[in-house]
Amino acid sequence: MLFRSIGNAVTSVKTNLMFQIDPYTGAELTELPMNYVFSPLPMFWAYISKVTGVHPAIIAHIFIPMIFIPMSYGVAYMIAKRIFGDARLEISLFMVLYAVLQQYGYVSVYTASTFLLFRIWQGKAMLANVFLPCLLLLGDTALKKDSKKIQCIPLLFASLATCCCSSMGVILGGIEMALLVVVYFCSSKKVSVLCRGIMVCIPYVILGCAYVLIKL
């Protein structure tokens, strides 16, 4: 999987084709790899490589970590501010604990810490460390009973990004959003909260149905 993610991007740049050539063998694919069609992040790296002229491996291993690792810490900081308000000591302790857990979280190749520090260019690494926490943060902003409708727009874009970074994002992001909608609707008893929640869940429903129909 580590090779295939970058291999797909390199193959697309060299052949000018998307999901038509097997990056392992160079043979033409007889059917679309559905898991990758619904997680087109390697194609985005290929696009950036095509536009900039920088090799996809350099983009993935050097430039992407420079963006998304600080972004992960930024989301954690914003969550800490949401929890502790202006209490700087508590926020600082939260961030120190977060950094320690990330630095010493390599107890398995499947932990979020491993994905963050070793292969953040993969969609599921971004999903676990950036987009799912971001959905929690933006969902808390957009689904409160006194929130404005325009505050749903960032949450909607975050939902679209979650769906595009990994096929698991459609499932996990949809479950997270559904739970947030249920919690905030039950606490507020307002139909407007339910309507906003349904709106931001639309990408998950559409892509989930499309995936099931194509697999059938």
Predicted regions and their residues:
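Active-site lumenal/periplasmic loops and adjacent helix-entry segments of GT-C-fold
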Residues: 1-103, 109-121, 126, 130
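Hydrophobic core segments of transmembrane alpha-helices in multi-pass, intramembrane catalytic enzymes
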Residues: 69, 128-136, 172, 176
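Membrane-interfacial loop-to-transmembrane alpha-helix junctions, especially the N-terminal start
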Residues: 88-94, 148-155, 193-200
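Membrane-interface transmembrane helices that cradle and orient dolichyl/undecaprenyl
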Residues: 132-151
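Membrane-interface alpha helices of multi-pass inner-membrane proteins
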Residues: 151-167
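Membrane-lumen/periplasm interface segments of specific transmembrane helices
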Residues: 197-216
